[in-house]
Every structure is written in structure tokens, then in C-alpha cells.
């Protein structure tokens, strides 16, 4: 089933970009936020020394573009059952990665087409199909 007729947008992020971000962040020791309080605190910081960062491509892609990239990489057309949007679903989501970029100067860049192609090649090689 393809909901909202494939018109929803999602932030697809290639695994190598995620690994690169984690590697860059691992050596940055977070500092406690002395101004943090339960009442006014952000879930990304606290009085304990930790930080939470979004790792994403920050470039939402229509679901149909993702499906098309998969079809091209596999060399076959998917059987698609187009459906209306489901109650409670959202049309567009993406990650705010500015804090990550500000910290380590990294923003994921791998396109959906390139990432899907790389994944399909890896999958076929790994499973010898």
C-alpha cells in the first residue's frame, strides 16, 4: 500500500551518512547545561552532561521518488496499491540538523537515488542474489 498516493515527504538518510555523523560526534564531550530546569528544559540537554542530535538529510523526498529509486535500482516495477492518507499521518517530516552541523560541520549529502542504489548493490552482494 502506498498512502496519500505517494505524495507524503520523508527525510530518508543513508546509513553511511549516519555513521559519519556518529563518528564525528563521538569525540565531542558534551557539557552539562547549568541553566537547565525541569520546567523550562529542552529534551536535547539537561543538567547532566549529554546532548541529543538529529541525524537526517533535512531534504524531504516524496515517497514516490523513493519508490522510483528502488524500482530503478532493482530493475523492476513495484506493485503499488495507491491509498488515501491515513488518519493521524503527517504529510511532511524532516530532521533539524543545524545543531549537529554547528558542532561538527557535517550534513548528510547522499541522495535517495544514490543511497538506494548503493543499498541494493550491497544487499545483492551480501546475500549473493
What are the residue ranges of the model-derived segments?
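C-terminal substrate-binding subdomain of Rossmann-fold SDR/epimerase-dehydratase oxidoreductases
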Residues: 1-129
Amino acid at each position: 500500500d502506498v498512502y496519500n498516493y505517494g505524495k507524503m515527504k520523508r527525510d530518508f538518510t543513508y546509513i553511511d551518512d549516519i555513521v559519519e555523523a556518529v563518528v564525528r560526534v563521538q569525540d565531542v564531550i558534551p557539557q552539562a547545561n547549568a541553566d537547565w530546569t525541569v520546567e523550562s528544559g529542552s529534551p536535547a540537554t539537561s543538567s547532566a552532561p549529554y546532548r541529543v542530535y538529529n541525524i537526517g538529510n533535512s531534504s524531504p523526498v516524496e515517497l514516490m521518488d523513493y519508490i522510483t529509486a528502488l524500482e530503478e535500482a532493482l530493475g523492476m516495477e513495484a506493485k503499488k496499491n495507491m491509498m488515501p492518507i491515513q488518519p493521524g499521518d503527517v504529510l511532511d517530516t524532516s530532521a533539524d540538523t543545524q545543531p549537529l552541523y554547528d558542532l561538527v560541520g557535517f550534513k548528510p549529502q547522499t541522495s535517495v537515488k544514490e543511497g538506494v542504489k548503493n543499498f541494493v548493490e550491497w544487499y545483492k552482494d551480501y546475500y549473493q542474489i
